[in-house]
């Protein structure tokens, strides 16, 4: 009776609402990360007398802390669970984003300067003192941001595993991962104008409110997450048909009860951190991320400054915003890339793991295109923009 009812019932699609929340969180994650790269050259550097070295130091430490925090973020999310783990992660990084806005005030107080105008007008040895002091404060805020942001992808992947069967997880992952592209896409057309607007009305130097406004988006997400998220088996918005679809990997008619029990035991088995390194999959992901993430983050952090220095377009000009927008618009192709493993499965009958590996091999060739960005940039600024977009 129950089987007939489930099969004839129209399936709800609440899993896609959850996926949209993951998308939103990832977009906010990248928005918060981009505020500094889009404001430092034209808004922050004149105030604190920064050079490329100062900014590079901040981004390097952020990247190191983010990498270290990632080692523990997954365990933290497993310990707290998807709901609380995600809430804590986004609360920490949103707080970190907002803390950036206090760095100017903290620098003034530390050096006993009257106001921002005295800081901008400083000369001689004082400029170096201002730069170094402010860098320390920005590093502190950046560390908080990095620790919080490290929890986004482990939490999102855990939720995806809870709400999607194995055959759909790559596509769902590509959708929420596209939030990083959307966040980066929205950033150049929202953050510099925000900073310019608040500067024009006399609210600080403008960049402070950009950090606060963008950081506040995370707190809005937290309210929605508390209301919307429950595990699918206890969520009243997930009907029986959808729950059966989500749990189809646990109800494979081609497997015996013993095989299913063994598979469930393996999936639920907890292993130590060091034991993870015994699996070749761990090393494959580690090496893959090591080889690609550094390149992507380099483009993420430095492209706005590259456009400003090489082509003379400040971050708040229409041309600069258009160039960054087009770059990240091209990376939106990643959504369709997530569908490739499903296409391979349907056409070849390969298992999900083999299909994902084949798709990853194809995508691994794309970053090589970035080698042509700099030499072709001598002919037109459009070449590096398009090439970096495709490589990303």
Cite the ranges covered by each PLM segment.
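Extracytoplasmic
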Residues: 17-52, 107, 299-304
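Residue-level signature of mid-helix packing/kink "hotspots" within the transmembrane helices
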Residues: 34, 63-71, 150, 184-185, ...
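Extracytoplasmic gate region of multi-pass secondary transporters
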Residues: 36-41, 274-335
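Primarily marks hydrophobic transmembrane alpha-helices of the MFS/SLC 12-helix fold
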Residues: 86, 138, 357-360
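C-terminal ends and interior cores of transmembrane alpha-helices
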Residues: 91-131, 361-378
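Cytoplasmic helix-loop-helix junction between adjacent transmembrane helices
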Residues: 137, 141-180
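Helix-loop-helix hairpin linking two adjacent transmembrane segments in secondary transporters
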Residues: 176, 180-236
């Amino acid at each position: 009776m129950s089987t007939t009812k489930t099969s004839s019932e129209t399936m709800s699609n609440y899993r896609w609402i959850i996926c949209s929340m993951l998308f939103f969180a990832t977009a906010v994650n990248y928005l918060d990360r981009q505020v500094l790269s889009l404001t430092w050259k034209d808004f922050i550097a004149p105030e604190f007398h920064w050079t490329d070295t100062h900014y590079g130091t901040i981004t390097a430490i952020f990247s190191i802390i983010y990498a270290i925090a990632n080692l523990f973020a997954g365990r933290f999310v497993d310990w707290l669970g998807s709901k609380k783990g995600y809430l804590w992660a986004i609360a920490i990084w949103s707080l970190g984003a907002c803390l950036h806005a206090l760095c100017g005030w903290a620098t003034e107080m530390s050096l006993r300067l009257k106001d921002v105008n005295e800081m901008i007008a400083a000369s001689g040895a004082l400029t170096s003192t201002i730069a170094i002091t402010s860098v320390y404060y920005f590093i502190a805020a950046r560390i908080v941001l990095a620790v919080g942001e490290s929890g986004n992808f482990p939490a999102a992947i855990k939720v995806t595993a809870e709400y999607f069967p194995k055959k759909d997880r790559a596509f769902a992952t590509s959708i929420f991962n596209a939030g990083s592209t959307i966040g980066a896409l929205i950033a150049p057309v929202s953050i510099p104008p925000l900073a310019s607007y608040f500067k024009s009305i006399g609210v600080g130097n403008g960049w402070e409110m950009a950090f606060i406004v963008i950081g506040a988006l995370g707190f809005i997400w937290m309210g929605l997450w508390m209301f919307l998220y429950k595990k699918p088996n206890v969520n009243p918005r997930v009907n029986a048909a959808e729950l059966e679809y989500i749990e189809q990997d646990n109800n494979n008619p081609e497997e015996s009860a013993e095989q299913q029990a063994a598979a469930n035991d393996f999936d639920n088995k907890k292993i130590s951190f060091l034991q993870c390194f015994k699996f070749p999959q761990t090393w494959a992901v580690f090496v893959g991320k090591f080889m690609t993430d550094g390149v992507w983050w380099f483009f993420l952090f430095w492209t706005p400054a590259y456009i400003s220095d090489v082509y003379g377009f400040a971050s708040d000009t229409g041309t600069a915003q258009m160039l960054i927008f087009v770059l990240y618009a091209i990376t939106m192709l990643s959504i369709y890339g997530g569908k490739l493993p499903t296409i391979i499965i349907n056409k070849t009958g390969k298992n999900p793991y083999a299909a994902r590996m084949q798709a990853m091999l194809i995508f691994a060739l794309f970053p090589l295109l970035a080698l042509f960005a700099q030499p072709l940039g001598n002919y037109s600024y459009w070449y590096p923009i398009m090439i970096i977009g495709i490589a990303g």
